């Protein structure tokens, strides 16, 4: 354990170095950033064996620690996932540079021209838990948008993240970018998080990515603005107008494709108007696929294998092969349930009736709403953003997938030819 004085000195040094790097990155040309991202992608490929060996240490420790199946899935790397990280960096390199974009332009009656221009936020602090791929995604998105990054990964993924960081730094510095463009807190001491959240002189925004307890701590303690992602309590509503086969395909994917991601459906709502034809097949499909179903009285009557749902189940992010299933009286009741029990993340409706669908899309107070598509599309890569640094469920500055454009703020550039303000 480090002393509080040592931790303060360590974190302040990281902050000062990040601030210096951010000033360089803000003026780095697009071509140089893209070259560095491609070099980092190649470095990750070259270091695949080292990264997997480091991940094996984390997996062994995680299993010994008794991490859940969902947490272990998030932590686990294999050659395909490492290659996906490398390709993700190359995808980000191909994105348009968000820095320097003219967001709006106008000319005043006195002849002055005014433009609102996108600029980097500066230094972004990212606090995350078990997903080592966040190391690569976050660093790449921040670099592309001209920001320096301070990463604080969880102890579960410490060795994996360090190995990925080494590859990233090698790629960045080989192309002439500052080594401090991306840094990682070099200790697993939880007290480092508290110090990081007080570095308002050096960090411009905090992005927490992890479980409810982590995000709640960050929200409570941070003196720095943050992109908030509390939970992914996502819903799929099957309307009375829904095609059953489409509903089955979407629901199975939304729940079971990957149960441990924030876009996985946690509650299935079925319109009472189609419960007689749709509910039992949907429930049976989920149970047969290995999903535990916790349901209301109607769902229990549809299949004897359904477990009674508690009040808490309707507001639970399972991140596992468990789902709550309930019957509601139409789209209005579905929207009311979602806005009451959800986390404002992602909701989907399966319906053939476009008017009902519009009611749902307009009524759900969530960052992402989908019609006839799986909630697992709640992902920056699937949105064409290259990757995401997280999904913001707040409403200030950024909402939904946070990609390169959302990692910029703006300045006003005013050009005149001698104008002065009259007295």
Swiss-Prot record:
Keyword Cytoplasm tagged: yes
Broad class of where this protein is predominantly found: cytoplasm
CDD domains documented for this protein: ALDH_F18-19_ProA-GPR
Coiled coil ranges: none
The keyword Cell membrane appears for this protein: no
HAMAP family registered for this protein in UniProt: ProA (MF_00412)
Family designation: Belongs to the gamma-glutamyl phosphate reductase family.
Annotated protein name in UniProt: Gamma-glutamyl phosphate reductase
Organism: Paramagnetospirillum magneticum (strain ATCC 700264 / AMB-1) (Magnetospirillum magneticum)
């Amino acid at each position: 354990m480090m002393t509080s004085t040592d931790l303060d000195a360590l974190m302040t040094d990281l902050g000062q170095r990040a601030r210096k790097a951010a000033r360089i990155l803000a003026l780095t040309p697009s071509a140089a950033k893209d070259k560095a991202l491609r070099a980092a992608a190649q470095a990750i490929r070259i270091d695949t064996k080292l990264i997997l060996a480091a991940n094996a240490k984390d997996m062994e420790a995680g299993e010994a620690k008794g991490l859940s199946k969902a947490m272990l899935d998030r932590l686990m790397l294999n050659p395909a996932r490492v290659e996906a990280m490398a390709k993700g960096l190359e995808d980000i390199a191909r994105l348009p540079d968000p820095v320097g974009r003219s967001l709006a332009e106008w000319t005043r009656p006195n002849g002055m021209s005014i433009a609102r221009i996108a600029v980097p936020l500066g230094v972004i602090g990212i606090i995350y838990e078990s997903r080592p791929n966040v190391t690569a995604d976050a660093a790449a998105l921040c670099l592309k948008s001209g920001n320096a990054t301070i990463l604080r990964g969880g102890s579960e993924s410490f060795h994996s993240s360090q190995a990925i960081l080494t590859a990233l730094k090698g790629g960045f510095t080989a192309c002439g970018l500052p080594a401090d463009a991306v840094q990682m807190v070099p200790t697993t001491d939880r007290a480092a998080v508290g110090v990081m959240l007080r570095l308002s002189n050096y960090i411009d925004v905090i992005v927490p990515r992890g479980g409810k307890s982590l995000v709640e701590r960050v929200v409570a303690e941070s003196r720095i603005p943050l992109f908030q992602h509390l939970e992914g309590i996502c819903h799929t509503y099957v309307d009375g107008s829904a095609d059953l086969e489409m509903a089955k395909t979407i629901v199975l994917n939304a729940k079971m494709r990957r149960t441990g991601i924030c876009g996985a459906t946690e509650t299935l709502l079925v319109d009472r108007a189609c419960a007689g034809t749709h509910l039992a097949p949907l429930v049976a499909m989920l149970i047969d696929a290995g999903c535990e179903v916790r349901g209301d009285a109607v769902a229990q009557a549809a299949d004897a294998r359904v477990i009674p749902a508690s009040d808490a189940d309707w507001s639970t992010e399972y991140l596992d092969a468990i789902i709550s299933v309930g019957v509601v009286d139409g789209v209005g009741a579905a929207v009311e349930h979602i806005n009451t029990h959800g986390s404002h993340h992602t909701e989907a409706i399966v319906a053939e009736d476009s008017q009902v669908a519009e009611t749902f899309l307009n009524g759900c107070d969530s960052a992402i709403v989908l019609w006839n598509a799986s909630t697992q599309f709640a992902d920056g890569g699937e949105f064409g953003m290259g990757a995401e640094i997280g999904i913001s469920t707040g409403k200030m500055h950024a909402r939904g997938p946070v990609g390169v454009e959302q990692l910029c703020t703006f300045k006003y550039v005013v050009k005149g030819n001698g104008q002065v303000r009259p007295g």
